[in-house]
C-alpha cells in the first residue's frame, strides 16, 4: 500500500502573504452579534475600498477583487449545562455501582462458601441467555427455587419486610438482595440527624411554615388544634377537599388569597401565584413537577428572593405529609413501615386491577383490549409498560369511565391519586435515607445472630448507605481535572470508611469557596458579596431610597429625601420590619415633619429591597446593639458568607466555632441551621472600599449622603466629576501576562458563551483586516453589539399582555369602550390587533385626544398624530410610555418640550384618572405634567440626548477595553496610554434612526448582507460625528476622560442641549420642529474650527447608497469541528440520549452499544450518532462479490466517538473502513464550502459516519436584490401588523413589482439553488397571483408578520432547505443535494475569517502532480 505517497491535508492554512501597506487612513466598523459579526472598512470619504486578493490553490484563478465589507456567520456558542448534567448523572451511577461493589466485597467470602457464582449471575442477569456465563436464573440458579421465591416475595419490599420482622435464619442471598436494594435506592439526605417513621412531625413542620409565612407576609395566623390538621391531611379524601378543610381552620383567610394558594401546594395540587403577587402572567407551581425548581426560580425572579424561605418551608411540610402517607400502616409492630406501606400499595393495586378489568370487560371487548393490551394508548398497558405517566393514565381513565354508571369507586380513588399506584413513583423522592437505614438495622440485627460477619461489619454496611461526598469536596478525580478541586492528605483509593483520613475537608472547602464565588463585573479582581450580605442589602436599600421623592401641601415641587431622612427611615422602618411600604414613608414624613397631603415617587406600594438578613440575625442573636455596631461588620459578613457557601451543617458548625467566644452555643446552633442562597453582582470593595479622590467618600457614603444631587449607583460610577469611573476602568486593564492569550481573556468576561464567541471572532477579524491593510493600524474601530435574545417568561409574553392589561384597567375606570368600540376592519380585538400603537393608545386613552379631550374616531386612527411627550430631539424613546394619540401634535401648546401649562391644567384630572386605573404609568403622568415643575432643565435635556448616543452596557465596554489594550499599548512619560487607535462605541439606535431617515431599509429575510451594512453605517456615523465635533471624543472614545474646563464644561447647559439635539441632524437637509416649523441646513456640513468638509448630503449619501447596493459582500460561514450533535435544533451529546431497542433482523440501523462490550444487535443502543467532520478520501475500494478494485474519490464521515481513533492513526482508521491504496485525505470541517462549475455554492454540513452516501448539504449562495425590491419587501413584511395605511398603500401601489421579483427569484433558483421541480410548482401557483389578496401575497413572499418563516425566501436563503407555503400551495423541502453532487466539477474553497483570503482546490485536478 502506498502509505509513503499519501498526502493528508487539513484545510486550516496560514494566509501569510504580505500585503502592501495601506497609504490612506481607514476605520473599521463592527456589528457583533451572538451568531454573526458584520465588518466594514471605510476610508475618510466613507467609501469601502476594494483590493485585488491573491488566491492560493490549484485553480486557474489567481486573483479576485473584493470589497472590504463582509460578515462572518457561526453557530451560536452554547452553555455547558448539557455536559454538566450528563457528567453529574455519570458520577451518580458510578457511585451507586461502587456502593454495590463495596457491599459485595463484604459479603464475598461468606457468599463463596454458599454460592460462588451468585454475584456473577446477578451481573449477567440482564444479558441474553447466550451471553450468560452461568444459569439464566439469577438468584438460585434453578427454576424451582426461583419460582418459590417469586411466589413468596412478589416485590423486593415483601422480602425486606420479611427479613426485618422475622427471627428465622434467612438465605444469605436474600439478605444481600434486601441490603443491596436499600443501598442502591437509599433516599434523600435533606433531613439531618436521627429520624424515624415515628417522629415525622407534621404538626411541627406546619408550625414552622406558619411562623415563616407570618414573618414574611406580616400576618398573625395561628392554629390551636394542630392535631386536627394532621387528621385532615392523613384522611382518605381528595386533595381539594383537604385544602378546603384546612382553610376552614383559619376563618379570616379567603379562598382566593395567598394562604389558600400555599395550601394547594402543600396538599399536592397546583397553585397559581399570579394574582397574589400582581403579576401579568400565570405563575403556576406544583411540587411534584420535575420543573418545580426552575418554575420557582422564575417566580422568585419576579417577586424577590425574600420569599424563598416560605416556599422552602411549604415544600418541607409537603414532603412530611407525603412521607406520613407512606408510613401510615395498620401493623404497628413491624420494623419495616416503608416496606409495609409498599406491600399495601401492591395489594391494593392487585385488587383494584381485578375490579377494573371486570368492570371494563362488561363494557366491551374492544374497550378492554384498548385499555389492557394496546400500549400505544394511555391505558393500563401503556401505563404499566412505562410509556404513559400516572397523570395521563388518570386523565384517560376519567374520560373513559365518566360515560358509564357504577364507576364512582374508581373515580374517587383517581381524584385522591390513589388508584393503581406503582411501586416506584415520583413521591418516593420524599423518603429520607433514615427510613431505609431503620429497616437495614432491623435486618442486620436479626440476621447477625446467624451470620457473625454481619455483626462485625454492621458499621461498615451502614456507612455504605449513609455516606455521601460533601458537595463542597466535589468530584474525587485526581490530576488536572477541570471539574475537581478536592485536596487530599494521602494518595490512596477513597472508600466510605477512609474518607476523613484521605480528604482534607477544610482545605477542599476553601477551594470550593474560591471556585464558587464569581467576580465583580466592575472590579474583575474582586469577589462578589453574597446576595444576603448585610452590606449588600444596606447598599440596595439606600440605592432605592436615594431616588424616592415626595411632595406635600404647600410644596411647589417634588423633593428628594435628605441624608437624615434616609438614615431615619432605615433605622425606624427597615430595621423594624421586613417589608417597608409607601405608607411607612408617608407616616414618617407626617409624624416627624408634620407634612400633609403627601405623594411619593420612586416607590410603588413597597420597596423592592429590604434588610431581611438583619431581621434573621436579630431573631437568632437577639442583640440589636451588636448588629448595629459597625465594628462587628466583618464578623457578620463572614457568618453570612459561610451560611451562603455551605449547606452541610457540620461544616457550618466547624467554621462558626471560631466565634464561640462571642456567641453562646445556642446562638451558634441556630445559626448553623440557617442557610442563604444566591450571590450579588458587586463586591465589598466597590460598594464601600474604593473612594473618590476629592471627597474621600465611598459609593455607599454617597448613597447615604449626596447633598442635593441624590445620585444612585449607576450615576455615581459614570459621573465624570467623580473618580469612581476612572478607577473602575483602571481595574479592568488586562495584565501583560494575559494579553497573549486573548481567548482566555474573552472567556473570563461576564456574559453568555454566545456573546463571548462573537467577541472572540470580532477580534480575529480586526487582526486580519489590519494584515490586509499591510499592517497599518486603523484610525478608529467602531463597535456595536447586538442585545442578546431574552428568553425569560416575561420577555416571551410581553406581546400577549396588552389585551389583559386593557381589560383590567378599563374595568377599573368603568369604561366599556373595549367592547363597544371596535374598528370596522376588525371582527374582534385581540393581542395581534393591539400591536398597532394607534389602536392600543386609543384604548389606553379611553378614546380621547390626550391634549384636548375630544373624542377620536376609531376608524380614522391613521389620520391622527402620535406625539412623543419627550420630543425625539431629546430622547429616542418609542415606548408607549412616551407616546400619546392626538388629533394634532400642535395641541400640546406653546411648549416645544412638553404639553404646556395651559394643557396640563385642563387635562390633569383626566390623566390622573388614567393613572389610577393603570392605563398610564407614573412616569408617563410625570412627563405629561412636567410643565408644572418648570419643564425640562437644560441639563436634563443634555443628559437625555447623551444617553441615546453613548453605549453604556458593561459588556460593550469590555470589548472596547480589549481592543484598546490591543492597539494602544504604548505609554507616555506619565505612564498613560498613547491612543493612536480610537475605540468608539455607539448605540444601535443611531444606525436605526439613520436607516429610517434615509429609507435605507433592512430586510433580514433576503440575505445576510445586513450585518455588514450595519457595521458600515456605524463606521460612517461615528466618523462623520467626530469629524464635525472632534471635541466629542471624550464622550464616545474608550479611555478618554473629559478634562477640566473641557468642551463640555465650557458650554452652558442651554448650548449643550442645542448641541446634543442637533448631532444627528448633520445628515439632514432640513429639520421639522414640533411646532410645525421647518429649518433648512447647509448642503455641506463642515467642521467650524478647521473648515474641513464633513458631510455632503448629496454625494456622501449617494456613496452610502452605493455601498449598500454592492452585490459583492464577503459572507463566510465559520467552519468548525463539531463537539456535539443536534437533536431538533438543540445540542445533544455523542448520540441521542435515550436507548433504542435492538434493531429488527436485516435492519441497516446503526446503533452505538450502551456499553462497549454489549452488542447493539442484541441489546439495542444509541441512535443518532453525532458527526464531527468529514474527510475526502482518494484511493481504492473492493466492490461487489468479486471484490473488484475500483478507484474512488468520496467522503467519509468521522463521528465524535471515532475522532480520537482517527487522530491516532488516520491511515489505519480508513483502511479498516475498507479503503486501500490511499493517495489523499482532505479533512473537511462542518460548513466546508464547495463551488460548482455553474457558480452555485454548497456547504457540507455533515456526512453520516455510518453511511457515506448520505449527508446534509446546505445552500451557499446569497441572493442580491435591488433597492426597489428591498423597499417593497420592507413594507410587505409590515402590512398586517398595523392599521397604519402607509405600508399597505405602498404595496398596493407597487403590486406589479411582485411579478418582476418572482421571476427574478425563480431565475436565481434555476441558476444557483437547483430546485427545478419546486420552481415548476411555484410557477404554476403564481399564475393566479392577481386573484390573491395583498395580505396573502405579502406573507407568501416574505413570511407572515411576527413569524421567523421567510416565505419564498426559504427557497433562496443560505442554509438547509425548508418547506414553505406559497399562495396556498405547499412547497416541499428540496432534498436532491447528495454528497456525490459535490464531487462533480467542484472546487473546494477555504476562506479566512474575513473571506478576503482564499485557497481553492479543484477536485478534478487532484492527483495531478
Curated annotation (Swiss-Prot):
InterPro entries: Cas9, Cas9-BH, Cas9_PI, Cas9_REC, Cas9_RuvC, HNH_CAS9, HNH_nuc, RNaseH_sf
Annotated positions binding Mg(2+) 2: 31, 788, 1011
UniProt-annotated stretches for the region Disordered: 1121-1151
Activity regulation description: Only has nuclease activity when bound to both gRNAs (crRNA plus tracrRNA).
Uses, biotech or industry: The simplicity of the Cas9-gRNAs RNA-directed DNA endonuclease activity may be used to target and modify a DNA sequence of interest.
Biased composition (Basic and acidic residues): 1121-1130
Pfam families on file: Cas9-BH (PF16593), Cas9_PI (PF16595), Cas9_REC (PF16592), Cas9_RuvC (PF22702), HNH_4 (PF13395)
Entry keyword set: Antiviral defense, DNA-binding, Endonuclease, Hydrolase, Magnesium, Manganese, Metal-binding, Nuclease, RNA-binding
GO molecular function: DNA binding; endonuclease activity; metal ion binding; RNA binding
Active site residues of this protein: 31 (for ruvc-like nuclease domain), 868 (proton acceptor for hnh nuclease domain)
Domain HNH Cas9-type as annotated: residue spans: 792-949
UniProt keyword RNA-binding, yes or no: yes
Cofactor note: Endonuclease activity on target DNA requires Mg(2+).
Cofactor(s) this protein cannot do without: Mg(2+)
EC number: 3.1.-.-
Residue spans of biased composition, Polar residues class: 1137-1150
Disruption phenotype: Plasmid transformation is restored.
Binding site for Mg(2+) 1: 31, 784, 788
Domain of life where this protein originates: Bacteria
Family that this chain belongs to: Belongs to the CRISPR-associated protein Cas9 family. Subtype II-A subfamily.
Subunit structure as annotated in this protein's UniProt entry: Monomer. Binds crRNA and tracrRNA.
NCBIfam families assigned: cas_Csn1 (TIGR01865)
Extra remark: This strain encodes 4 CRISPR-Cas systems; this is CRISPR3.
Biological role: CRISPR (clustered regularly interspaced short palindromic repeat) is an adaptive immune system that provides protection against mobile genetic elements (viruses, transposable elements and conjugative plasmids). CRISPR clusters contain spacers, sequences complementary to antecedent mobile elements, and target invading nucleic acids. CRISPR clusters are transcribed and processed into CRISPR RNA (crRNA). In type II CRISPR systems correct processing of pre-crRNA requires a trans-encoded small RNA (tracrRNA), endogenous ribonuclease 3 (rnc) and Cas9.
Domain notes: Has 2 endonuclease domains. The discontinuous RuvC-like domain cleaves the target DNA noncomplementary to crRNA while the HNH nuclease domain cleaves the target DNA complementary to crRNA.
Protein known as: CRISPR-associated endonuclease Cas9
Species name: Streptococcus thermophilus
Amino acid at each position: 500500500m502506498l502509505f509513503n505517497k499519501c498526502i493528508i491535508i487539513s484545510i486550516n492554512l496560514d494566509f501569510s502573504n504580505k500585503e502592501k501597506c495601506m497609504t490612506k487612513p481607514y476605520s473599521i466598523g463592527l456589528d457583533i452579534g451572538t451568531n454573526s459579526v458584520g465588518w466594514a472598512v471605510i476610508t475618510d470619504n466613507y467609501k469601502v475600498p476594494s483590493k485585488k486578493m491573491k488566491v492560493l490553490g490549484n485553480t486557474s484563478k489567481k486573483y479576485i477583487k473584493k470589497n472590504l465589507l463582509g460578515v462572518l456567520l457561526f453557530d451560536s456558542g452554547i452553555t455547558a449545562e448539557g455536559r454538566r448534567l450528563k457528567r453529574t448523572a455519570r458520577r451518580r451511577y458510578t457511585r451507586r455501582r461502587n456502593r454495590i461493589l463495596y457491599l459485595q466485597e463484604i459479603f464475598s467470602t461468606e457468599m463463596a462458601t454458599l454460592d460462588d457464582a451468585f454475584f456473577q449471575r446477578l451481573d449477567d442477569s440482564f444479558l441474553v441467555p447466550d451471553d450468560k456465563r452461568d444459569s439464566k436464573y439469577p438468584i438460585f440458579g434453578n427454576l424451582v427455587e426461583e419460582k418459590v421465591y417469586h411466589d413468596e416475595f412478589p416485590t423486593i419490599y415483601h422480602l425486606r419486610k420479611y427479613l426485618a420482622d422475622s427471627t428465622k435464619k434467612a438465605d444469605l442471598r436474600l439478605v444481600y438482595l434486601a441490603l443491596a436494594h436499600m443501598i442502591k435506592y437509599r433516599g434523600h439526605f435533606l433531613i439531618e440527624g436521627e429520624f424515624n417513621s415515628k417522629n415525622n412531625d407534621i404538626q411541627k413542620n406546619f408550625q414552622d411554615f406558619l411562623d415563616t409565612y407570618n414573618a414574611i407576609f406580616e400576618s398573625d395566623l395561628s392554629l390551636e388544634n394542630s392535631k386536627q390538621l394532621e387528621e385532615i391531611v392523613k384522611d382518605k379524601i381528595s386533595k381539594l377537599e383537604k385544602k378546603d378543610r384546612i382553610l376552614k381552620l383559619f376563618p379570616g383567610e379567603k379562598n382566593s388569597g395567598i394562604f389558600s394558594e400555599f395550601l394547594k401546594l402543600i396538599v399536592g395540587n397546583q397553585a397559581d401565584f399570579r394574582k397574589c403577587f400582581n403579576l401579568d402572567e400565570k405563575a403556576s407551581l406544583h411540587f411534584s413537577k420535575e420543573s418545580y425548581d426552575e418554575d420557582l426560580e422564575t417566580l422568585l425572579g419576579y417577586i424577590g428572593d425574600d420569599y424563598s424561605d416560605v416556599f422552602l418551608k411549604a415544600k418541607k411540610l409537603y414532603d412530611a405529609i407525603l412521607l406520613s402517607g407512606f408510613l401510615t400502616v395498620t401493623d404497628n409492630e413491624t420494623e419495616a413501615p416503608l416496606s409495609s406501606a409498599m406491600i399495601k400499595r401492591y395489594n391494593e393495586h392487585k385488587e383494584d386491577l381485578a375490579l377494573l378489568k371486570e368492570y371494563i370487560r362488561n363494557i366491551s371487548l374492544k374497550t378492554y383490549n384498548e385499555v389492557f393490551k394496546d400500549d400505544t394508548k394511555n391505558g393500563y398497558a401503556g401505563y404499566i409498560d412505562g410509556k404513559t405517566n400516572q397523570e395521563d393514565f388518570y386523565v384517560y381513565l376519567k374520560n373513559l369511565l365518566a360515560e358509564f354508571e357504577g364507576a364512582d369507586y374508581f373515580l374517587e380513588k383517581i381524584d385522591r391519586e390513589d388508584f393503581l399506584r406503582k411501586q416506584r413513583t415520583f413521591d418516593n423522592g420524599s423518603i429520607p435515607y433514615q427510613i431505609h437505614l431503620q429497616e437495614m438495622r432491623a435486618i442486620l440485627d436479626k440476621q447477625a445472630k446467624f451470620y457473625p460477619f454481619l455483626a462485625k461489619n454492621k458499621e461498615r454496611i451502614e456507612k455504605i448507605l449513609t455516606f455521601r461526598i460533601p458537595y463542597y469536596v466535589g468530584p474525587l478525580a485526581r490530576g488536572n481535572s477541570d471539574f475537581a478541586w478536592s485536596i487530599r492528605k494521602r494518595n490512596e483509593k477513597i472508600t466510605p470508611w477512609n474518607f476523613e483520613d484521605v480528604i482534607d475537608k477544610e482545605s477542599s472547602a476553601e477551594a470550593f469557596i474560591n471556585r464558587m464565588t464569581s467576580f465583580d463585573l466592575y472590579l474583575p479582581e474582586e469577589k462578589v458579596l453574597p446576595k444576603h450580605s448585610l452590606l449588600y442589602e444596606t447598599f440596595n436599600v439606600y440605592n432605592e431610597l436615594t431616588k424616592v421623592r415626595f411632595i406635600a401641601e404647600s410644596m411647589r415641587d417634588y423633593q428628594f429625601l435628605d441624608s437624615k431622612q434616609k438614615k431615619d427611615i432605615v433605622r425606624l422602618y427597615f430595621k423594624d420590619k421586613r417589608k417597608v411600604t409607601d405608607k411607612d414613608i408617608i407616616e414618617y414624613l407626617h409624624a416627624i415633619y408634620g407634612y400633609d397631603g403627601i405623594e411619593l415617587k420612586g416607590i410603588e406600594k413597597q420597596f423592592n429591597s429590604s434588610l431581611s438578613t438583619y431581621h434573621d440575625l436579630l431573631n437568632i442573636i437577639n442583640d440589636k446593639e451588636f448588629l448595629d455596631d459597625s465594628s462587628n461588620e466583618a464578623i457578620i459578613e463572614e457568618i453570612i458568607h459561610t451560611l451562603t457557601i455551605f449547606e452541610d451543617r457540620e461544616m457550618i458548625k466547624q467554621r462558626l466555632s471560631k466565634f464561640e467566644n462571642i456567641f453562646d452555643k445556642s446562638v451558634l446552633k441556630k445559626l448553623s441551621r440557617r442557610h442563604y442562597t444566591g450571590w450579588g453582582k458587586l463586591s465589598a470593595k466597590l460598594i464601600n472600599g474604593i473612594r473618590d479622590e476629592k471627597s474621600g467618600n465611598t459609593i455607599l457614603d454617597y448613597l447615604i449622603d449626596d447633598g442635593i444631587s441624590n445620585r444612585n449607583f449607576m450615576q455615581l460610577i459614570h459621573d465624570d466629576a467623580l473618580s469612581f469611573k476612572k478607577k473602575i476602568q483602571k481595574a479592568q486593564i488586562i495584565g501583560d501576562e494575559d494579553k497573549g492569550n486573548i481567548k482566555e481573556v474573552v472567556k473570563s468576561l461576564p456574559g453568555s458563551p454566545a456573546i463571548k464567541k462573537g467577541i472572540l471572532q470580532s477580534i480575529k477579524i480586526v487582526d486580519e483586516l489590519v494584515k490586509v491593510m499591510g499592517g497599518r493600524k486603523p484610525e478608529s474601530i467602531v463597535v456595536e453589539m447586538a442585545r442578546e435574545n431574552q428568553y425569560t417568561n416575561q420577555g416571551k409574553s410581553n406581546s400577549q399582555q396588552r389585551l389583559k392589561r386593557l381589560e383590567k384597567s378599563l374595568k377599573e375606570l368603568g369604561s366599556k369602550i373595549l367592547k363597544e368600540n371596535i374598528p370596522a376592519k376588525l371582527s374582534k380585538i385581540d393581542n395581534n390587533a393591539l400591536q398597532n400603537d394607534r389602536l392600543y393608545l386609543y384604548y389606553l386613552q379611553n378614546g380621547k385626544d390626550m391634549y384636548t379631550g375630544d373624542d377620536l374616531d376609531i376608524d380614522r386612527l391613521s389620520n391622527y398624530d402620535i406625539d412623543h411627550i419627550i420630543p425625539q430631539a431629546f430622547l429616542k424613546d418609542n415606548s408607549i410610555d412616551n407616546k400619546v394619540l392626538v388629533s394634532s401634535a400642535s395641541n400640546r401648546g406653546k411648549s416645544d418640550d412638553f404639553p404646556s401649562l395651559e394643557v396640563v391644567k385642563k387635562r390633569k384630572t383626566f390623566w390622573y384618572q388614567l393613572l389610577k386605573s393603570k392605563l398610564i404609568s407614573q412616569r408617563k403622568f410625570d412627563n405629561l405634567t412636567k410643565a408644572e415643575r418648570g419643564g425640562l432643565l437644560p441639563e436634563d435635556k443634555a443628559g437625555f440626548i447623551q444617553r441615546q448616543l453613548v453605549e453604556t452596557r458593561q459588556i460593550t465596554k469590555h470589548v472596547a477595553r480589549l481592543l484598546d489594550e490591543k492597539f494602544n499599548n504604548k505609554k507616555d512619560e506619565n505612564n498613560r496610554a498613547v491612543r493612536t487607535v480610537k475605540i468608539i462605541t455607539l448605540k444601535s439606535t443611531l444606525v436605526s434612526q439613520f436607516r429610517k431617515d434615509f429609507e435605507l431599509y433592512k430586510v433580514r429575510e433576503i440575505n445576510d448582507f445586513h450585518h455588514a451594512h450595519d457595521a458600515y453605517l456605524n463606521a460612517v456615523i461615528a466618523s462623520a460625528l467626530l469629524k464635525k465635533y472632534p471635541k466629542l471624543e471624550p464622550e464616545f472614545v474608550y479611555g478618554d476622560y473629559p478634562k477640566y474646563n473641557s468642551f463640555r464644561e465650557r458650554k452652558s447647559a442651554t448650548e449643550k442641549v442645542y448641541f446634543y439635539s442637533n448631532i444627528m441632524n448633520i445628515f439632514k437637509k432640513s429639520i421639522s420642529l414640533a411646532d410645525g416649523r421647518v429649518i433648512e441646513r447647509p448642503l455641506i456640513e463642515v467642521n467650524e474650527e478647521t473648515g474641513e468638509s464633513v458631510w455632503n448630503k448629496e454625494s456622501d449619501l449617494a456613496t452610502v447608497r452605493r455601498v449598500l447596493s454592492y452585490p459583492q459582500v464577503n459572507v463566510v460561514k465559520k467552519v468548525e469541528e463539531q463537539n456535539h450533535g443536534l437533536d431538533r435544533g438543540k445540542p445533544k451529546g455523542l448520540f441521542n440520549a435515550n436507548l433504542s431497542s435492538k434493531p429488527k433482523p436485516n435492519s441497516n440501523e446503526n446503533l452505538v452499544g450502551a456499553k462497549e462490550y454489549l452488542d447493539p444487535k442484541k441489546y439495542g443502543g444509541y441512535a443518532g450518532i453525532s458527526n464531527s467532520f468529514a474527510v475526502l478520501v482518494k484511493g481504492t475500494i473492493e466492490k461487489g462479490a468479486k471484490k473488484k478494485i475500483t478507484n474512488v474519490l468520496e467522503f467519509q464521515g468521522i463521528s465524535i466517538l471515532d475522532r480520537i481513533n482517527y487522530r491516532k492513526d488516520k491511515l489505519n482508521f480508513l483502511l479498516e473502513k475498507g479503503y486501500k491504496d490511499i493517495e489523499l485525505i482532505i479533512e473537511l470541517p462542518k460548513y466546508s464550502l464547495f463551488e460548482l462549475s455553474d457558480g452555485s455554492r454548497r456547504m457540507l454540513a455533515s456526512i453520516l459516519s455510518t453511511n457515506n452516501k448520505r449527508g446534509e448539504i446546505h445552500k451557499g449562495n446569497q441572493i442580491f436584490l435591488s433597492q426597489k425590491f428591498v423597499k417593497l419587501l420592507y413594507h410587505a413584511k409590515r402590512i398586517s401588523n398595523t392599521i397604519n395605511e402607509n405600508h399597505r398603500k405602498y404595496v398596493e401601489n407597487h403590486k406589479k413589482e411582485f411579478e418582476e421579483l418572482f421571476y427574478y427569484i425563480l431565475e436565481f433558483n434555476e441558476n444557483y439553488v437547483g430546485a427545478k421541480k419546486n420552481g415548476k410548482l411555484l410557477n404554476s401557483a403564481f399564475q393566479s397571483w392577481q386573484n390573491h389578496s395583498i395580505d396573502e401575497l405579502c406573507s407568501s413572499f416574505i413570511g407572515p408578520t411576527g413569524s421567523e418563516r421567510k416565505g419564498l425566501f426559504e427557497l433562496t436563503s443560505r442554509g438547509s432547505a425548508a418547506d414553505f407555503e406559497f399562495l396556498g400551495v405547499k412547497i416541499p423541502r428540496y432534498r436532491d443535494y447528495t454528497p456525490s453532487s459535490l464531487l462533480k466539477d467542484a472546487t473546494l474553497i477555504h476562506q479566512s475569517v474575513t473571506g478576503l483570503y482564499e485557497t481553492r482546490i479543484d477536485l478534478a485536478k487532484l492527483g495531478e502532480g
